[in-house]
């Protein structure tokens, strides 16, 4: 099964080796046909503590690291 990959903005980096990423999704309302934005926050593993608030990052699913952390930061060559 492929792992999900999402893109979002870092909203918190206060924890050690953990960042909170806010992911925004857009969808069309079934009845009113208006586009709606919804956001969700994910705790992601940042091994090197290199990402700061406001950074645009990509995260992917992984095996559970702690109770709330099941995502890790994807390190691309572009970053």
From Swiss-Prot:
Molecular function terms from GO: rRNA binding; structural constituent of ribosome
Disulfide bridge partners, by residue number: none
Record-linked CDD domains: Ribosomal_uS17
GO annotation, cellular component aspect: cytosolic small ribosomal subunit
Pfam families according to UniProt: Ribosomal_S17
Subunit structure: Part of the 30S ribosomal subunit.
Purpose of the protein: One of the primary rRNA binding proteins, it binds specifically to the 5'-end of 16S ribosomal RNA.
NCBIfam families (UniProt xref): PRK05610.1, uS17_bact
Name of the molecule in the record: Small ribosomal subunit protein uS17
UniProt organism field: Rhodospirillum rubrum (strain ATCC 11170 / ATH 1.1.1 / DSM 467 / LMG 4362 / NCIMB 8255 / S1)
Lineage, broadest ranks: Bacteria, Pseudomonadati, Pseudomonadota, Alphaproteobacteria, Rhodospirillales
Gene field: rpsQ
């Amino acid at each position: 099964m492929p792992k999900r990959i999402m893109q979002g903005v870092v909203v918190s980096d206060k924890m050690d080796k953990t960042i909170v990423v806010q992911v925004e999704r857009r969808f069309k309302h079934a009845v009113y046909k208006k586009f709606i934005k919804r956001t969700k926050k994910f705790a992601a593993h940042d091994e090197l503590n290199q990402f700061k608030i406001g950074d645009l990052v990509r995260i992917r699913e992984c095996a559970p690291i702690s109770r709330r952390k099941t995502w890790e930061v994807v390190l691309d060559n572009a970053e």
